[in-house]
A protein has these predicted regions:
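C-terminal lobe and adjacent flexible extensions of AdoMet/dcAdoMet transferase-like proteins
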Residues: 249-270
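Conserved beta-strand signature within the Rossmann-like core of class I S-adenosyl-L-methionine
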Residues: 87-89, 175-183
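S-adenosyl-L-methionine
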Residues: 100-132
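Conserved Class I S-adenosyl-L-methionine
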Residues: 191-219
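A short glycine-rich, Lys/Arg-flanked "PGG" loop and its adjoining helix->strand segment in the class I
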Residues: 77-78, 159-174
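Class I SAM-dependent methyltransferase Rossmann-like catalytic core
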Residues: 25-58
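Conserved class I S-adenosyl-L-methionine
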Residues: 59-68
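A short acidic, Gly/Pro-enriched loop at the edge of an enzyme's catalytic core
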Residues: 132-144
Length: 270
């Protein structure tokens, strides 16, 4: 009887922890820290479902690679700020960097100061060719990157991709999770399209992750969009929110919506 009671208690605690994590993600997604403009894109980016799929919990150390202006950071930081840690592996900048990169990093760091919305968050640097120490080795429970792999491939090819996934593997604890969301190129498409379209083949990303030592644990269709053919005049930027063709066929591309995206969960072996 005592053993049964212990099992029931353990199961109850497990369910409670799951609900607590879900509630933390939901609360963060609906928080006032996020602008209404940011929340409007939840229709396409599905942050709550995506982060639950990856297994985000409040006590985790989470590294977000290339967080940009902080669309996902608003949610991630809010979830882990009390019990865990948020690390932003932002752009690497030096004297030769563009003003955009410099301003982006400076603006993000300003938000980590006392009294600001990411107070206490850590900012590191990432570049697939110049800066690979995104966090202390073996310190992260989770590494996440959203719609960035195509940039590294277009800028640095296979070497850049291998360096990136190697850096993610190094930063994670054994058993840690790598979550990747990326614009998906059909497997039947010419591989050359990855060089300029902004879309990547799922098989290519899985192979790159496995080469670094990861195991594919699961995939999700939560960010899939079957209306997106991935064949557009200006690549993925033809679609919203960019709408690179501006008024040309605007209604057509708005009707398609944002891109079809793969959502992949990898694990670093124990």
């Amino acid at each position: 009887m005592k053993k049964l009671a212990q099992l029931v208690l353990a199961a109850t605690l497990g369910v409670t922890a799951t609900y607590a994590s879900a509630d933390a993600i939901s609360d963060a997604a609906m928080s006032d820290i996020r602008s209404e403009k940011a929340k409007a894109r939840d229709e396409y980016r599905h942050p709550q479902q995506t982060l639950r799929f990856f297994g985000l919990k409040p006590d985790m150390t989470v590294v977000e690679v290339s967080p940009g202006g902080g669309w996902y950071a608003d949610i991630l930081y809010s979830v882990v700020k009390e019990e865990g840690k948020y690390v932003a592996a932002h752009f690497y900048v030096d004297d030769s960097s563009s003003d955009y990169y410099k301003k982006s990093v400076k603006g993000f760091k300003e938000k980590t100061k006392p009294g600001m919305k990411y107070e206490g968050a850590e900012v590191t640097a990432f570049d697939p060719m110049k800066a690979l120490d995104i966090a202390k080795a073996g310190s992260a429970d989770m590494v996440l990157t959203f719609r960035n792999v195509h940039n590294w491939y277009m800028g640095h090819g296979e070497e850049g991709i291998n360096n990136a996934f190697g850096a993610f593997f190094k930063a994670l604890k054994p058993g840690g999770v790598l979550g990747v969301v990326e614009h998906e190129l059909p497997e039947s498409a010419d591989v050359e399209a990855m060089k300029k379209s902004g879309y990547m083949k799922r098989s290519y990303i899985i192979a790159a992750a496995e080469k670094a030592g990861f195991m594919l644990e699961a995939s999700s269709d939560v960010n899939a969009n079957p209306m997106d053919t991935a064949d557009h005049p200006r690549g993925v930027w033809t679609l919203p929110p960019r709408l690179a063709l501006e008024e040309q066929d605007r209604d057509k591309y708005l009707a398609i919506g944002e891109s079809n995206r793969m959502t992949l969960k990898f694990k670093k072996p124990n």
